[in-house]
Amino acid sequence: MSSISIIGLGWLGEPLAWHLLEKGHLVKGSTTSPDKLSGLQSKGIETALLKFNPHPEGIGFRSLFETDVLFVNIPPRSKSVPEGFYAEQIKFVKELAVQSKVKKIIFVSSTSVYPDWNQKVDESFPLTFENTGSQGILRAEQILQSEKSYDLTIIRFGGLLGVDRIPGRYFSGKSNVTGDSPVNYIHQVDAVRLSSWIIEKNLWNETFNGVAPMHPLRKDVYEKNSQELGFAPPISYAEDGEAMWKEISSDKILDTGFQFQMPDSLDFWYRP
């Protein structure tokens, strides 16, 4: 049995915690919400209040870093925060992890680090600050990768969807919507399973894309969502070829033996 601490018991982190508990692991985690604290604790997750602002603020969070595996799930904030804020958050996470001699870290990154160059890309793509789609996220990855005293695996998730996150709803009734580019989505269930798989199989010091292997067009996903769930589709779509795109390969994680429960975004289930 491993002890696993999840920094960020949110939309992905909380279901991952339940999944790991069911597998017999000791699970700890953090939330930024005092309202969620008691509910999480009552269900068996040792939970601390912790917010990186960008320095750590909270109560009782030091014990989170006394763990076998640290799962870092801090999404970048909106563009309203100063440039470099996210990198500073990750620096403080690393500092706490190193102080506590954490041996294994999983960092939740994003496929937004890849540029939209109208091509298929995999983990070997040579990212630089000049070509990346997100300098902030790439910088965060590099902070954790540099001068490290721990095993580190990075998961670059695509669009985290399913359950209450319905892609077509975000574009319902909108005009001039991009429809002809491939989607790079992953269902919540598979994002949880993939994260757990990396821990179970000891897949350390790697970078993996977390994206369903099939890539239907955006228009097809939005239209199917509207038909099945009963809301309006987009009013109109942009002309084909206007938007740049990328198609993210999931071959590397598939080669480890991982199997997606929902390999096609057209088959995602939702609970609106």
Report residues per predicted region.
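Conserved N-terminal Rossmann-fold NAD(P)-binding element of oxidoreductases
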Residues: 4-8
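N-terminal Rossmann-fold NAD(P) dinucleotide-binding loop
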Residues: 13-14
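C-terminal amphipathic/interface module of NAD(P)-dependent oxidoreductases
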Residues: 46, 50-54, 233, 240-272
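NAD(P)-cofactor binding segment of oxidoreductase domains
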Residues: 62-106
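Conserved Rossmann-fold NAD(P)-dependent oxidoreductase catalytic core, especially the SDR/UDP-sugar
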Residues: 92-130
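Conserved beta-loop-beta element that borders a ligand/cofactor-binding pocket
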Residues: 139-163
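Substrate-positioning beta->alpha
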Residues: 154-157, 166-167, 176-199
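Mid/C-terminal beta-alpha module of Rossmann-like enzyme folds, strongest
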Residues: 192-249
